[in-house]
Amino acid sequence: MEDRNQHFAVTLKAIRKAKKWSLDRASQATGVSKAMLGQIERGESSPTLATLWKIAEGFETALSTFIEPKPADNQDARVRTATELRRKPVSDDMLMASMFTYDERFGFEMIELTLMPGYERIADPHEQGTTEHVIVVKGDMELLLNGEWLPMPEGSALRFAADCIHGYRNLNDQPAVFHNLIHHAKISPDR
């Protein structure tokens, strides 16, 4: 947990400084309190997934930027396993593995998400033009789109504009696992 908090802290501070934003300005852009942003930057607080999404959206950067460091090398071919990457964000009943962090050459990030039984998350709209590609690889889940929960059985896939309120839930007694490829229309170049 210490390493993760340190990564959150260093990344948040670096992005904020690159934008030349004060904590007040960052708070306005993200909807996260100045106090909470300061605690994260000092490594004193572990943000929830919902908070990380708000921060990523406010800074116009990819969520995966905060999950793990960008690879130092520029390898196009490398094997990654979800098992070694999977993490549980603090106070969220969801597991997350950043399969591919955001790369500006491709314009997307790919995340594996595991929803525990009974988990539900409503996501705020992403930046204009963002598209999500959800592929259910294990179990059944539901996806909220246009105010309606759509059943997503194992093996199903859905692409949708994610610049609106949407959500994910698992009403079953077994975990549901899905891959989410998020294509960003634009990402701030000074991320």
Describe the residue ranges of each PLM region.
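A short glycine-rich, His/Asp/Glu-containing loop-to-beta-strand
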Residues: L85-D124, N180-A185
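Double-stranded beta-helix
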Residues: L171, A176-R191
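Short acidic-glycine-tyrosine-enriched beta hairpin
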Residues: G147-A161
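Short, conserved beta-strand element in jelly-roll/cupin
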Residues: E112-M116, E127-L143
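A short, Lys/Arg-rich alpha-helix, primarily the initiator
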Residues: M1-A18
